[in-house]
């Protein structure tokens, strides 16, 4: 074990990591972490990152994450930016970057601007506290982009791609950095594919000459051998499909393309076999690849990958810049630096990669070695045992680590995630499709056929069973899915799979599995050594995708080898690639297994089970006949599927015995068993619950479970993988089940809680198993009864026919043909009986044959609807039940006559062919006919002979009591189907037909859809397998009666031998037709055609067509020599057509006999034919009506859909129009409102202008009186000026109120006048106008004296109080004419100033104006603009703050301590005033707010 577990490999083994679910993944935190990790690494160097900066986050006591203060400080201080920027931007050492602004400027010089949500990031943003993280992320992203641009450019990428791709299209060239990175990845990966293709061609060339397998006398065997044994050759043709990268983030989440890129540059560090390349990547597969990439970057690229697994897996768009910089770093390493380990891959000739050197190359898994790595040194089965116990919980689907490839690259097997056996993952195991992780199909069509696997993915065999269902959409229907490989999610104690590690883990193994052909030959029986090896059930998919665990191809081949004494066995390459070899220690069991395997039972069983597997669906009935003789549609036979169920029980017996032995000998079978059914501690897909839960079982229980596992998929239609919870699902540790087997993986054995669960599962399974067996036994009884009944029916029907025809004389030809058929039938019956005596095998063989030969018989029992097989077995016709010795003797004599007529029938073939041509012409006139090519008589005869020799061949089957079975390969499959349909329709008039044993059958076919050659189909339920198309010779009965009774007897014998069921189901005509078919197919080997033709003319019918069996019609015709296919419209004259058919059938049988043969034997009744014709016409009419109705319905449906679509479009259009109208109306109303408001404003201004103009005179008169005011104002040095400043009305100025001024009590008249002309605005406010509009009106009125004319409305500025101060000066501080000079000067100073904010300085709380100051809120500086007072005022000097109230035209005291932009006036402490200054008279004190 130690040699297998290389410590380095162990270290590189990946465990399925615990990742955060998508719902819990914090994208913003991930972005911050990625950016900071990159920035810190670039600032300090990867090796020198301070410890406190390695993890930027810390968690507080409330479990909340925050960025560490040191990191925040470094960001705020710009140290990280300056360090990284100096490196990235290559700034001058003499002029290092200092501060955020320097870095921003340096980036700007490169054409990169730091923007956060389309806003330029400034140094102020980067200095903000608390830290504004979005600005810093934008800064780091810009630095990343600068680094990316330095490392990668479009020119560099194109130059690099030119090394690997000579051809360029202008449209392909990248247009930006991101596109350039994707272009580089795709070009390199394309080049890698080309290299692999070239290497593959070399390998193919090298392996073409290698023997693919041993020839066998059986053509069936020979056809199977290449596909199975040459699996390596076919698998070589599959290249890993490295996905194209079209979206850098989303297409990189599985790591396939990136890992392939790394492999190309570092093929010795990251081998292609170590990369998980699959069509459908599971979560674990993606994580595996991403871990592989991360580990590579960690070890070789200076830790340039600053992502977590979640970052790469979820690929948020926010980390695109991080991903780009990572790819740029890769490009720099691979294309610029090119360290020693970077050695771009080149085409390596065959054998250039020494296998033995592989251990020295870093490998990702201890279990990856190929069996072929060394011919003598095999890793022991316990390879994975040294893995730590903490890993033992890995779900089984991730635990199959074998990711190895042979030196020739045969089969790459990647474990889905961990490559480690016995670890548990962090996500629950999901139910998956029944095919677990096997990505290939086995095609047996041709030796050189390429196996169809999931499209061109690199890992042709993935051990992951998640998401790797067989791509049935890409697999042809006939490619059977025989998954002979070990199911993937089985957890073995030791990772070695039988295919790869062909040695037992125990040291007592006497020898290793031979690796060369000679050794394999000498150990021919090696395949039998393990019951659960090649011979144990494999996962087989039936037509419905359910698992049927049946023997695999290799098992069948091995059985054939054993029975046929074939000397050769597959080569080591093929063994390693999937042929399961087992250690010689099991040779003791060879005899036991051989008994079962070589027994005819097992041979046939295996073949039967495999029949659905072969691509052309050839069914081997126990004798290897040419492939042409094997019917093609066996895979559709439900009875065959049923048969495979019983088959497995036999297969189980040997394996059970071996299992018991295995357990007793303490052999670690798990290490060697690729079979799902092995009862091991690994919860394999087919393993029982007990095995998954680690309960030790007795051999009896084990047998029960093995059997259960076999039948789970088959009987229940679902794989045991789905029904049996695996250990990982049950959270039960996987434990070694047998005490004798040492624990190699060191997994804990939890047998307390797990035993309870397991024992319950055991009981459940036992009950199910008993039920299954009871059902199976009943089924077998039914089948046996059915077989006996068929034999009885055959004999009875034949004797009945003989009796009825006893009076007539049949022509020698007919006698000969009939005799031959009967003879063959009896021979076949005898063979069948002898086979049945052999035991289960013969019984199953007979069942297969019966199912093949007697689909019709089953139908006849159930004329129109499929009947439960059990019920079908019991059906029998009354005439067939009466059987006596005399009849049997007559039957035997008739067979002899048939033999003698064989030669004569051959001579008749020429004449029949002429007749066929005539009939074909008529058919063309009357109906649509599709006639398959008619095989030559020699070929058919030849086919007949081998089948006859085989005794079990399909050709002989028709003569047996079984219903006819076609011996012809492909044409028959189609023919069979149509014929089967005809049988079904004919069966409807069954009561009458039973009376008239054989003739009416031909007419019924036209009734059904089958009458249309292309439309003919048989429902599988009705005809499980139509192995042979039926030749319907319509009037067999009539002509035969005339010609000779013996010939009719012969024909009827044929019919009966083919299927007495047919006789029961069909009228005599049917039977005769069938006999002809059998004679034709067997003796004349005429192609049996499914088309049932109604012969339109009695004349043609009258023409003798004795050997209708001979292909009078092309393959379609042989079946219905007398039948002419008539189109539904042509079926109108059914009577006439039917009669000719009947006659013609008879006449075709006795072609030599002319019109005198028109005599109708009891089998032909014209009335019945007419009735059938009528029915056929009715059915045709019904069918036409139905078709017409369907077409009309379809048309109506289409019309309705079109109307609905039109209505929807109309509704959509109307809705859009309405929406547009509403928007237009809204816009129009808004415009009208705005216009109205504008006009109203102008009008108000004009009104106020006219009202205010006379006002100054009144004011003057009234103001003359208070002389103190005049004095007060005159004394002030500044004179007011008329209102240019007031003309620009701002929002501030408009906010003045309309209250009366309270400068002095003597102002009341003025205030009254003001109130008078403020009334319009008040009315407006009553009408709902905005208050600010009222205010503007008021202010404009108040400043009416200075207003010189209409002014444009100006939107007030929110940041300036300039207009408020102007208002205050004009209406409060320096109001009146006296102060006009002073006011004018002050306003002029204000206009000159650039300041936005002004402050008025009052002397004290009396609000006497002293001076005007400018105020800067940013710097909080207060400087004098004009007036008396200190040059500048500081915060400490301020005593009170005042706000101007425009409504009341006075200042209000603000009880605040902090100066802000909303303050309009201030006072300073009184001690700051010089008392010597003349004191101005006090004004009226304003009211304090």
Curated annotation (Swiss-Prot):
Annotated spans, Disordered: 375-415, 611-639, 668-730, 812-844, 925-1017, 1032-1078, 1096-1152, 1191-1349
Extent of Polar residues compositional bias: 668-679, 960-989, 1287-1299, 1334-1346
GO BP annotation list: axon development; cytoplasmic microtubule organization; microtubule cytoskeleton organization; negative regulation of microtubule depolymerization; regulation of dendrite development; regulation of Golgi organization; regulation of microtubule polymerization; regulation of organelle organization
Annotated SUPFAM superfamilies: Calponin-homology domain, CH-domain, PRC-barrel domain
Key words of the record: Cell projection, Coiled coil, Cytoplasm, Cytoskeleton, Golgi apparatus, Microtubule, Phosphoprotein
Keyword check for Ribonucleoprotein: no
Molecular-function GO terms, alphabetical: calmodulin binding; microtubule minus-end binding; spectrin binding
Transmembrane segments: none
Pfam families, alphabetized: CAMSAP_CC1, CAMSAP_CH, CAMSAP_CKK
Subcellular location: Cytoplasm, Cytoskeleton; Golgi apparatus; Cytoplasm, Cytoskeleton, Cilium basal body; Cytoplasm
Domain CKK positions: 1349-1483
Start-end of Basic and acidic residues biased regions: 703-713, 1039-1075, 1132-1152, 1191-1252
InterPro entries attached to this UniProt entry: CAMSAP, CAMSAP-like_CH_dom, CAMSAP_CC1, CH_dom, CH_dom_sf, CKK_dom_sf, CKK_domain, PRC_barrel-like_sf
Domain Calponin-homology (CH): from-to ranges: 222-335
Record comment regarding domains: The CKK domain binds microtubules and specifically recognizes the minus-end of microtubules.
PANTHER family per the UniProt record, alphabetical: CALMODULIN-REGULATED SPECTRIN-ASSOCIATED PROTEIN 2, PATRONIN
Job description of the protein: Key microtubule-organizing protein that specifically binds the minus-end of non-centrosomal microtubules and regulates their dynamics and organization. Specifically recognizes growing microtubule minus-ends and autonomously decorates and stabilizes microtubule lattice formed by microtubule minus-end polymerization. Acts on free microtubule minus-ends that are not capped by microtubule-nucleating proteins or other factors and protects microtubule minus-ends from depolymerization. In addition, it also reduces the velocity of microtubule polymerization.
Protein name, as recorded: Calmodulin-regulated spectrin-associated protein 2
Organism for this UniProt entry: Homo sapiens (Human)
């Amino acid at each position: 074990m130690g040699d297998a577990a290389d410590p380095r490999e162990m270290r590189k083994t990946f465990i399925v990591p615990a990742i955060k679910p998508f719902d819990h993944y914090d994208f913003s935190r991930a972005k911050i972490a990625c950016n900071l990790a990159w920035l810190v690494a670039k600032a300090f160097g990867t090796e020198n990152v301070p410890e406190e900066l390695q993890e930027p986050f810390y968690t507080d006591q409330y479990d909340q994450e925050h960025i560490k203060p040191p990191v925040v400080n470094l960001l705020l201080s710009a140290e990280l930016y300056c360090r990284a920027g100096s490196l990235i931007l290559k700034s001058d050492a003499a002029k290092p970057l200092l501060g955020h602004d320097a870095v921003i400027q340096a980036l700007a010089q490169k054409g990169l601007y730091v923007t956060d949500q389309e806003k330029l990031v400034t140094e102020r943003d980067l200095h903000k506290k608390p830290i504004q993280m979005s600005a810093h992320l934008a800064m780091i992203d810009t630095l990343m982009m600068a680094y990316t641009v330095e490392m990668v450019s479009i020119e560099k990428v194109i130059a690099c791609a030119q090394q690997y791709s000579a051809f360029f299209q202008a449209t392909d060239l990248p247009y930006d950095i991101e596109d350039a990175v994707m272009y580089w990845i795709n070009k390199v990966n394309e080049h890698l594919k080309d290299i692999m293709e070239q290497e593959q061609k070399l390998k193919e060339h090298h392996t073409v000459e290698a023997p693919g397998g041993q020839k066998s006398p059986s053509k069936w065997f020979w056809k199977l051998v290449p596909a199975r044994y040459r699996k390596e050759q076919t698998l070589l043709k599959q290249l890993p499909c490295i996905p194209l990268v079209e979206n850098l983030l989303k297409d990189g989440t599985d790591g396939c393309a990136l890992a392939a890129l790394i492999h190309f540059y570092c093929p010795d560090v990251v081998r292609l076999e170590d990369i998980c390349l699959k069509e459908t990547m599971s979560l674990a597969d993606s994580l595996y690849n991403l871990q592989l990439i991360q580990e590579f970057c960690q070890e070789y690229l200076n830790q340039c990958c600053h992502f977590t697994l979640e970052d790469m897996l979820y690929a948020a768009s926010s980390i695109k810049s991080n991903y780009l910089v990572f790819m740029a770093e890769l490009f720099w390493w691979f294309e610029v630096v090119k360290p020693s380990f970077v050695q771009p891959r080149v085409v390596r000739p065959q054998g250039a990669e020494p296998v033995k050197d592989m251990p020295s190359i870093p490998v990702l898994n201890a279990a990856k070695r190929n069996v072929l790595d060394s011919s003598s040194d095999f890793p022991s089965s316990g390879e994975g045992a040294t893995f730590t116990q903490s890993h033992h919980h890995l779900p089984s689907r991730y635990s199959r680590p074998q990711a190895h490839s042979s030196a020739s690259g045969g089969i790459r097997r990647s474990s889905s995630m961990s490559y480690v056996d016995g670890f548990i993952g962090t996500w629950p195991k999901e139910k998956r499709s029944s095919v677990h992780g096997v990505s290939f199909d086995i095609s047996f069509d041709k030796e050189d056929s390429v196996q169809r696997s999931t499209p061109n993915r690199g890992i042709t065999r993935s051990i992951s069973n998640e998401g790797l269902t067989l791509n049935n959409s890409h697999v042809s229907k006939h490619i059977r899915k025989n998954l002979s490989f070990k199911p993937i999610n089985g957890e073995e104690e030791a990772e070695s799979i039988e295919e790869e590690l062909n040695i037992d883990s125990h040291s007592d193994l006497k020898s290793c599995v031979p690796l060369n052909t000679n050794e394999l030959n000498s150990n021919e029986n090696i395949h039998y050594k393990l019951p659960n090896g090649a011979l144990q059930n494999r996962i087989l998919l039936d037509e419905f995708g359910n698992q049927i665990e049946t023997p695999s191809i290799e098992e069948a081949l091995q059985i054939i080898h054993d029975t046929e004494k074939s000397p050769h066995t597959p080569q080591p390459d093929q063994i390693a690639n999937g042929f399961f070899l087992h250690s010689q220690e099991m040779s003791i069991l060879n005899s036991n297994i051989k008994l079962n395997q070589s027994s005819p039972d097992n041979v046939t069983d295996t073949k039967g089970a495999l029949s659905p597997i072969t691509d052309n669906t050839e069914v081997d009935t126990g004798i290897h006949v040419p492939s042409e003789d094997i019917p093609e549609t066996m895979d559709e036979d439900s009875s065959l599927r049923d048969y495979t169920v019983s088959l497995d029980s036999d297969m189980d017996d040997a394996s059970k015995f071996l299992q018991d032995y295995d357990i007793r000998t303490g052999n670690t079978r798990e290490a060697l068993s690729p079979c799902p059914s092995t009862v091991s501690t690994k919860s394999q897909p087919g393993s029982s619950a007990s095995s998954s839960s680690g309960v030790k079982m007795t051999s009896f229980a084990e047998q029960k479970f093995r059997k259960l596992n076999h039948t789970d998929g088959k009987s229940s239609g679902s794989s045991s993988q789905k029904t049996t919870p695996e250990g990982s699902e049950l959270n039960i540790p996987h434990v070694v089940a047998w005490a004798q087997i040492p624990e190699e993986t060191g997994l804990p054995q939890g047998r307390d809680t797990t035993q309870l669960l397991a024992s319950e599962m055991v009981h459940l399974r036992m009950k199910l198993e008993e039920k299954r067996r009871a059902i199976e036994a009943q089924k077998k009884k039914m089948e046996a009864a059915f077989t006996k009944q068929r034999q009885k029916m055959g004999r009875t029907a034949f004797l009945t026919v003989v009796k009825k025809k006893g009076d007539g004389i049949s022509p020698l030809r007919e006698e000969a043909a009939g005799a031959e058929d009967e003879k063959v039938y009896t021979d076949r019956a005898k063979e069948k009986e002898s086979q049945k005596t052999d035991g289960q095998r013969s019984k199953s063989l007979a069942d297969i044959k019966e199912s093949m030969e007697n689909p019709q018989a089953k139908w006849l029992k159930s004329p129109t609807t499929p009947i439960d097989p059990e019920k079908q077995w019991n059906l029998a016709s009354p005439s067939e039940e009466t059987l006596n010795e005399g009849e049997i003797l007559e039957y035997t004599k008739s067979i002899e006559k048939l033999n003698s007529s064989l030669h004569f029938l051959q001579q008749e073939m020429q004449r029949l062919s002429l007749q066929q041509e005539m009939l074909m012409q008529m058919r063309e006139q009357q109906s649509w006919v599709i006639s398959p090519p008619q095989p030559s008589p020699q070929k058919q005869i030849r086919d007949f002979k081998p089948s006859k020799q085989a005794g079990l061949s399909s050709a002989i089957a028709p003569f047996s009591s079984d219903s006819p079975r076609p011996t012809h390969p492909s044409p028959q499959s189609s023919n069979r189907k149509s014929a089967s349909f005809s049988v079904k329709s004919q069966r409807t008039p069954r009561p009458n037909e039973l009376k008239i044993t054989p003739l009416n059958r031909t007419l019924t076919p036209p009734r059904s859809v089958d009458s249309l050659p292309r439309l003919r189909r048989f429902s599988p339920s009705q005809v499980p397998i139509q192995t042979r198309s039926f030749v319907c010779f319509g009037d067999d009965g009539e002509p035969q009666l005339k010609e000779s009774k013996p010939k009719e007897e012969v024909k009827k014998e044929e019919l009966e031998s083919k299927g007495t069921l047919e006789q029961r189901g069909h009228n005599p005509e049917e039977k005769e037709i069938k006999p002809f078919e059998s004679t034709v197919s067997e003796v004349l080997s005429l192609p049996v055609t499914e088309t049932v033709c109604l012969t339109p003319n009695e004349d043609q019918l009258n023409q003798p067509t004795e050997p209708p069996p001979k292909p009078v019609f092309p393959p379609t015709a042989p079946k219905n020599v007398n039948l002419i296919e008539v189109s539904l419209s042509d079926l109108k004259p059914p009577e006439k057509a039917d009669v000719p058919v009947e006659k013609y059938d008879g006449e075709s049988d006795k072609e030599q006999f002319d019109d005198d043969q028109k005599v109708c034997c009891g089998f032909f009744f014209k009335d019945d034919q007419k009735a059938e014709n009528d029915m056929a016409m009715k059915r045709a009419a019904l069918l036409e009506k139905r078709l017409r109705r369907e077409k009309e319905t379809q048309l109506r449906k289409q019309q309705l859909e079109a109307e609905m679509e039109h209505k929807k479009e109309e509704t959509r259009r109307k809705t859009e129009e309405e929406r547009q109208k509403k928007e237009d109306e809204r816009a129009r109303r808004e415009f009208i409102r705005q216009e109205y408001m504008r006009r109203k404003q102008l009008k108000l201004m004009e009104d106020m202008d006219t009202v205010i103009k006379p006002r100054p005179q009144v004011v003057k008169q009234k103001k003359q009186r208070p002389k103190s005011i005049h004095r007060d104002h005159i004394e002030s040095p500044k004179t007011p000026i008329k209102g240019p400043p007031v003309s620009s009305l701002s929002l501030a100025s408009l906010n003045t109120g309309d209250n009366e001024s309270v400068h002095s009590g003597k102002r009341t008249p003025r205030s009254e006048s003001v109130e008078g002309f403020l009334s319009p605005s008040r009315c407006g406010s009553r009408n709902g106008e905005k208050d600010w509009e009222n205010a503007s009106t008021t202010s404009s009125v108040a400043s009416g004296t200075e207003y010189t004319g209409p002014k444009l409305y100006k939107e007030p500025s929110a940041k300036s109080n300039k207009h408020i101060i102007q208002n205050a000066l004009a209406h409060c501080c320096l109001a009146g004419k006296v102060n006009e000079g002073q006011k004018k000067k002050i306003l002029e100073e204000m206009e000159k100033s650039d300041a936005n904010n002004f402050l008025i300085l009052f002397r004290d709380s009396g609000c006497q104006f002293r001076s005007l100051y400018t105020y800067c809120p940013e710097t909080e500086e207060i400087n004098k603009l004009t007036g008396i007072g200190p040059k500048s005022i500081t915060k400490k000097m301020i005593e009170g703050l005042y706000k101007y109230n425009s409504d009341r035209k006075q200042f209000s005291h603000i009880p605040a301590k902090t100066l802000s932009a909303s303050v309009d006036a201030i006072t300073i402490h009184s001690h700051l005033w010089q008392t010597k200054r003349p004191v101005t008279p006090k004004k009226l004190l304003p009211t304090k707010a």
